[in-house]
């Protein structure tokens, strides 16, 4: 057994303003020569240098592994700031992952080099980073690095200056400690539940259509049929979507059966199909797995019951306005949100309509074929109106952000349905066989916040805590990010300035406190 030695090295990282310029995300070359640094003598490994990433929230710790040592994994933990109540950033890399990404060279030979990408750093702070190297013989070597980072000034003047309306306090139970905002102004922005920025990179492409997949971001291009893979080390890879009729992504990217679900615009028979097409795609290859034309789905259902769909399905018009979807493995189906109309469930394989849940005071309910497919909501429940962010909660209920906005694109003189002056998080239990639904839970913040469009609410997998994003609160001037414990008590409430939905059109928890790269 070797001696276990803890070494400390303090190095200052040059900063990067980040966030808004350049037309793309500059790639970091993992195998580049390390900057000059004073070597620290250690046993199985020595710290050679610490190099800055593309923003102050990212750094690269270069290590020299002694001859004969075979690395099995590298782990790091960033000590929280004093007074923080968020869990520390905690990341583990398998040696095979580091090698595959070019961060480990000639493992086991003399002078092997290993680079540990460290993300989630505090900006303008001396970060204490505890690194552990696990070797094949079972030995573990701790190395401690003090990493001074530069200040970060958000070029948008938004994300580095939240107003803390309610701070999370010590002991407040919450099933997540980090979340990311999907920004129309650049890359996703990761924030901890203290309100501290913990990750962003320079980018000009909107990250509104984004999701976490395989410990990295998948971002759909709002201007082209293209997918961008954005790693937490700041590197990127673009892949074309193999769908010749698709023109661009819009709204969200959601979990699918095999790949990811993307809301896209498309051209059909020479006419633009606006926000009514859903695809499942492989984010690594761009291959198309499945396509659902919701206009076709509803037309078939209407025609089968004797209705003429021409007055409802209107190509070239934003008649549907899809903004979210999710796969339901319990019956191999897909749940889709149409802001203008309703929530509907379709069969995964056939695309056939299974049921509709929506406000019967809207235009769609004037068609007998669609009314016959609708679920009746139990007494006292709120129908989904202008809803966003459909998902399956831990108890199997259908969760969504119930914005409260009536329809805006129905034909002249057609009923727009109910409108509310507040937004709510609603979760429904569905009785498909009995054609009924019950609003099982609701959080409406005392009916004090109205966020008419965009917005989201998602559970944390750990315990059912919920992150609520009021994207356009206060008459579209602020985004409000609110954390709820499992009892729907408000744990934190952060406010950011916004124009339209740009700041945080949608937001989700992210597990920076337990991330494993295999």
Protein language model features and the residues they cover:
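Sec-dependent signal peptide recognition
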Residues: 1-7
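Short, well-ordered beta-strand core segments
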Residues: 101-105
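Long, low-complexity intrinsically disordered segments that are proline/alanine-rich
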Residues: 22-38, 43
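Histidine-/acidic-rich catalytic cores in large beta-rich domains
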Residues: 38-83, 88, 93-97, 107-115, ...
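Bacterial signal peptide processing site
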Residues: 17-21
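C-terminal motif of bacterial Sec signal peptides marking the signal peptidase cleavage site
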Residues: 12-15
């Amino acid at each position: 057994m070797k001696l276990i030695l803890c070494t400390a090295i303090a190095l200052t990282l040059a900063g990067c303003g980040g966030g808004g310029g350049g037309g793309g995300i500059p790639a970091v070359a993992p195998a580049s020569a390390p900057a000059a640094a004073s070597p620290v003598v250690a046993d199985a490994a020595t710290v050679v240098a610490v190099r800055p990433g593309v923003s102050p929230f990212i750094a690269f710790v270069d290590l020299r592994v002694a001859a004969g040592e075979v690395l099995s994994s590298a782990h790091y933990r960033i000590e929280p700031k004093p007074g923080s109540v968020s869990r520390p950033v905690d990341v583990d890399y398998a040696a095979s992952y580091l090698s595959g990404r070019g961060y480990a060279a000639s493992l086991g030979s003399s002078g092997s080099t290993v680079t540990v990408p460290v993300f989630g750093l505090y900006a303008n702070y001396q970060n204490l980073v505890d690194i552990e190297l696990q070797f094949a013989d079972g030995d573990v070597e701790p190395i401690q690095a003090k990493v001074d980072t530069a200040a970060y000034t958000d070029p948008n003047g938004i994300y580095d200056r939240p107003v803390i309306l309610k701070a999370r306090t010590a002991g407040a139970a919450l099933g997540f400690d980090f979340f990311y905002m999907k920004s129309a102004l650049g890359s996703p922005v990761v924030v901890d539940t203290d309100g501290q920025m913990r990750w962003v990179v320079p980018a000009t492409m909107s990250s509104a259509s984004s999701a976490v997949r395989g410990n990295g971001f998948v971002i759909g291009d709002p201007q082209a049929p293209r997918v961008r893979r954005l790693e937490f080390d700041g590197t990127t890879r673009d892949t074309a979507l193999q769908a010749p009729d698709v023109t661009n992504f819009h709204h969200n990217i959601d979990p699918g059966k095999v790949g990811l679900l993307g809301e896209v615009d498309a051209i059909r028979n020479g006419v633009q199909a606006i926000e009514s097409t859903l695809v499942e795609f492989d984010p690594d290859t761009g291959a198309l797995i499945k396509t659902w034309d919701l206009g076709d789905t509803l037309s078939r259902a209407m025609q089968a019951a004797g209705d003429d769909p021409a007055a409802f399905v209107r190509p070239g018009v934003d008649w549907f306005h899809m903004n979210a979807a999710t796969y339901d493995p319990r019956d191999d189906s897909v749940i889709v949100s149409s802001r203008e109309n309703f929530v509907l469930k379709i069969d995964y394989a056939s695309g056939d309509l299974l049921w509709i849940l929506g406000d019967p005071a809207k235009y769609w309910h004037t068609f007998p074929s669609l009314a016959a497919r609708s679920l009746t909501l139990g007494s006292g429940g709120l129908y989904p109106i202008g809803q966003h962010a459909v998902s399956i909660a831990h108890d199997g209920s259908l969760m969504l952000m119930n914005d409260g906005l009536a329809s805006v694109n129905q034909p002249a003189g057609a009923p727009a349905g109910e409108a509310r002056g507040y937004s709510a998080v609603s979760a429904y239990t569905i009785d498909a066989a009995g054609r009924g639904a019950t609003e099982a839970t609701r959080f409406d913040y005392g009916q004090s916040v109205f966020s008419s469009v965009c917005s989201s609410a998602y559970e944390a997998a750990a315990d059912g805590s919920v992150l609520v994003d009021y994207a356009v609160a206060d008459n579209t001037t602020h985004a409000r990010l609110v954390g709820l414990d499992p009892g729907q008590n408000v744990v934190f409430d952060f406010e950011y300035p916004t124009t339209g939905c740009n700041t945080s059109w949608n937001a989700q928890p992210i597990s920076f406190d337990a991330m494993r790269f295999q």
